[in-house]
Structures are given as C-alpha cells and as structure tokens.
Swiss-Prot record:
Tissues showing expression: Synthesis occurs immediately above a small population of matrix cells at the base of the hair bulb and the trichocytes lining the dermal papilla and extends upward through the matrix and ends in the lower part of the cortex of the hair shaft.
Record gene name: KRT85
UniProt keyword list: Coiled coil, Disease variant, Ectodermal dysplasia, Hypotrichosis, Intermediate filament, Isopeptide bond, Keratin, Ubl conjugation
GO molecular function annotations of the record: structural constituent of skin epidermis; structural molecule activity
IF rod domain ranges (all copies): 123-434
Disulfide bridge positions per record: none
Species, as recorded: Homo sapiens (Human)
Region (Linker 1): 159-168
UniProt lineage: Eukaryota, Metazoa, Chordata, Craniata, Vertebrata
Region (Coil 1A): 124-158
GO biological-process terms attached to the record: epidermis development; intermediate filament organization; keratinization
Protein name: Keratin, type II cuticular Hb5
Length: 507
C-alpha cells in the first residue's frame, strides 16, 4: 500500500492539502478489509480545502474491484480523502509566502487497474447470466405450477373415478343375482323338460309296443293271406281239374253218343234188312239219352254251383284280404306317421335339452366369468387405488420439492434483485459522489456466511464476499455481500429487517 500527501499554501491564505492512497488486495486472499476513517472537517475560517484520492483493487479471480471516494464539507473548508482528509487549522488573515513542493511536479502513480473495464463488463455479463437463470427459474416455477395443477386435476379425477368405481360392486352383485335367478329358472326348465322327456319316452315306448303289435298283426295277416292264397290256388286247381274232367266227360259223352247213334243206325240197317218179330218183355225201359241228359244236367248244375261257390268264396276272401290289407296299410301308415312325429318330437326335445344344457353351461360360465371379472375389477381397483395413493404421495413429495425449489428460486430472485438494486445504488452513489463530492467512506470487503441488510432490511445468505462501505452521502452505511461465483449453487435462507442504518447485504 502506498500513500502520498501534498500541502500547497498560497499567499492569500489558502491552504490546499492533497493525499493519494492506493491499496491492492492480495490475489488469493479470501477476506480483505480496508477501512478509512471519515474526515469530518469543520472549520469556521476561510481558505481551507482538502482533497483525497484512494484506489482499492482486489485482483482475486472471484472478487470485484471497487474504487470509492468520499466528500465532507464544513462551513469554511473542504477535505477529500479516505484516511485523513487534509486538515488545516485556521490561518491568520495575513499574506503568507508561497512554497512549492517539487514532488508535486512528478506524475502521480495512481495505479489504476487497466482491466477495470473488462472486470465491469464481466460483472455485467454475470448479472445478465444471473438474470437469464432467474428467468429460467421463473419458467421452471411456472411449469411446475402447471404440473401441480395437472396433478391436482388428475387427483380430483381419480377421486371422482374412485367414487364411481365404488358403485360397481352392487352392480356386479345385482348382475350375479340376476344370472343366478336365470340359472335357477334354467334348472327348473331343465327339470320340467326332463319330466316331459320321460313322458315322451313312455309314450314312445307305448307307440313302439303298438307298432310291434301292428307289425305282428300284419305278419299274421300276411301269413293268413298266404294261406288263403294257397287255398285259392288249390280251389283254382280243383276247378281246373273239374273243368278238365267236365270236358273229358263231355267228349266221352259225345263219343258215346256218336257210338250209340252208329250202333243204332247199324242195328236199324240190319233190322231193316231182316224181318224178325221178337216178342220180349222190356220192362226196364232204359233210356240212355234221358239218363245222360239228366246226368249232364246234374253235373252242370253241380259244376255251376261249385264254380259259383268257389268264385263267391274267392271274391269274398279277396275282398276281405283287400279290406284287411287296406286297413293294415292305413294303420301302418298312421303308425309310421306317428313314429315319424315322435322321432321329430324326440329330436326337437333332444335339441331343446342340449340347448338348455348349453345355455345352462354358458350361464354358469358367465356367472363364473362375471365373478372372476368382479374379483379382477375389485383387485384392479384396489391396485389402482394403491397406485393412486402412491402417486398422490409422490406428487405431494414432488410438490414439496418443487415448493422448496420455488422458494430457493424466489430467494435467488430476491438476492439478485437486491444485488441489482445495490449495484445501481452504488453506481448512482459513485456518480453522485464524483459529481458533488461527499465525506470520507469506510469500505470493508470480506468473505463470510452472513446476512444482508438494506435500510434496516437484513437478508441471510450462503458464504460470499462482503463489501462494507462507510458513511455515504446520505449519512448511512452500505454493506454488500457479493455472491461467490466459484461456490456451488446451494439452497439459501433469507430474512429481511428494516432500520435506520441503511445497510444492504445480498448474496
């Protein structure tokens, strides 16, 4: 550190004091504190003027460089400086000699850092990046708020859905009861159909017995018909034999007639040739023609009566056989129709029974499936409820994390706002000081874990560098904690309080 002081006195009783002080903080130092006691020069005499210049430079990689000037005016004298402003006692109202200090002719080595503008530019870029990060944090907070609203909407929807799902159990129970009643009805129908099937089977057995009896009667009738046909054939053969005998007898009678006629003619010829008178007793009176005619008539009568009786008997038998055949055929046809009808009824009842059995099996399967689906739905609902509760718990945890991050982001935003306001205030104070000039300022730069206060407003932060300045133009002090750009981003806690000291501390 270098410090120079100059004193100039004029002949008109005006004394000017000039001082120069430069301080360079170590490069790797973590805490640098430079303080300058304020000079409160008060003089009621004329011609007192003081001027001071001080340069503070911290060449560390993470710290800022700050140059501060102070001004304090009295009633008749002015002084400039950090440590001790030029103080001059009251001078007598006489002409004094002028003394020139040759050392003032040498150029002042203010040791102004040429990289100060670059450092300021870097600080501006850091502020811009911090603002960008803050905007990103704000967007993230908005996105997380949207996600929170979405999760709340989902949670309300799932709660409503849970209420809807709670009504599924009575619905399933009612449906199962309906299926059970239908199954009972099907069982009753199956019992009724089984009794009807037994009755139909009994009727079928009766019809089968009747059919067998009719078949036996038909076989008996056919046997009788065969016997009658044999009798008819025998009668026809007998008739043929009789007709043949009749023809033979007719031929024989015709032969005998011709023979007798020839004998009679021969005898008549002999008789005509001889005249013999014979007297004989012909009491027998045998007339062959009458006998033959009578026999022939009797034979014809017997033959005609036999033919008529045979024909009538044959016709009657044929009519009886035809009637029997027609009757048995009609009975057989009706029996066949009844058998076909019974077969169709049996097939229909069998199909209905099979259909009832299939329907019963389907209903039992449907009841079992409905019970399984109900159990599966209930288990699925329980699983979904557990998942939703887990998701709700996770959402609450995520919400807590998001709220924590949001609080951290808001803390970062608040710190950045305070930092920006502090930098703006420092710049405005520096410009005001350069334009008007004020008293001396105490500046303290430190790196610590502390809080920030601004006009009674305190704010606690993470470890950083603290810059403390002494009395300002408004009669207060400014304390600034600059964020350590090399430190990792960590959660920060904050608190604010207001007072009269007008100190600012930010992270």
């Amino acid at each position: 550190m270098s410090c120079r002081s100059y004193r100039i006195s004029s002949g008109c009783g005006v004394t000017r004091n000039f001082s120069s002080c430069s301080a360079v903080a170590p490069k790797t130092g973590n805490r640098c504190c430079i303080s300058a006691a304020p000079y409160r020069g008060v003089s009621c005499y004329r011609g007192l003027t003081g001027f001071g210049s001080r340069s503070l430079c911290n060449l560390g990689s993470c710290g800022p460089r700050i140059a501060v000037g102070g001004f304090r005016a009295g009633s008749c004298g002015r002084s400039f400086g950090y440590r001790s402003g030029g103080v001059c006692g009251p001078s007598p109202p006489c002409i004094t000699t002028v003394s020139v200090n040759e050392s003032l002719l040498t150029p002042l080595n203010l040791e102004i850092d040429p990289n100060a503008q670059c450092v300021k530019q870097e600080e501006k870029e850091q502020i811009k990046s911090l603002n960008s990060r803050f905007a990103a944090f704000i967007d993230k907070v908005r996105f997380l708020e949207q996600q929170n609203k979405l999760l709340e909407t989902k949670w309300q929807f799932y709660q409503n859905q849970r209420c809807c799902e709670s009504n599924l159990e009575p619905l399933f129970s009612g449906y199962i009861e309906t299926l059970r009643r239908e199954a009972e009805c099907v069982e009753a129908d199956s019992g009724r159909l089984a009794s009807e099937l037994n009755h139909v089977q009994e009727v079928l057995e009766g019809y089968k017995k009747k059919y067998e009896e009719e078949v036996a009667l038909r076989a008996t009738a056919e046997n009788e018909f065969v016997v009658l046909k044999k009798d008819v054939d025998c009668a026809y053969l007998r008739k043929s034999d009789l007709e043949a005998n009749v023809e033979a007898l007719v031929e024989e009678s015709s032969f005998l007639r011709r023979l007798y006629e020839e004998e009679i003619r021969v005898l008549q010829a002999h008789i005509s040739d001889t005249s013999v008178i014979v007297k004989m007793d012909n009491s027998r009176d045998l007339n062959m023609d009458c006998i033959i005619a009578e026999i022939k008539a009797q034979y014809d009568d017997v033959a005609s009566r036999s033919r008529a009786e045979a024909e009538s008997w044959y016709r009657s038998k044929c009519e009886e056989m035809k009637a029997t055949v027609i009757r048995h055929g009609e009975t057989l046809r009706r029996t066949k129709e009844e058998i076909n009808e019974l077969n169709r009824m049996i097939q229909r009842l069998t199909a209905e029974i099979e259909n009832a059995k299939c329907q019963r099996a389907k209903l039992e399967a449907a009841v079992a499936e409905a019970e399984q689906q109900g159990e599966a739905a209930l288990s699925d609902a329980r699983c979904k409820l557990a998942e939703l509760e887990g998701a709700l718990q996770k959402a609450k945890q995520d919400m807590a994390c998001l709220l924590k991050e949001y609080q951290e982001v808001m803390n970062s935003k608040l710190g950045l706002d305070i930092e920006i306001a502090t930098y703006r205030r420092l710049l405005e104070g520096e410009e005001h000081r350069l334009c008007e000039g004020v008293g001396s300022v105490n500046v303290c730069v430190s790196s610590s874990r502390g809080g920030v206060s601004c006009g009674g407003l305190s704010y606690s932060t993470t470890p950083g560098r603290q810059i403390t300045s002494g009395p300002s133009a408004i009669g207060g002090s400014i304390t600034v904690v600059a964020p350590d750009s090399c430190a990792p981003c960590q959660p920060r806690s904050s608190s604010f309080s207001c007072g009269s000291s007008r100190s600012v501390r930010f992270a």
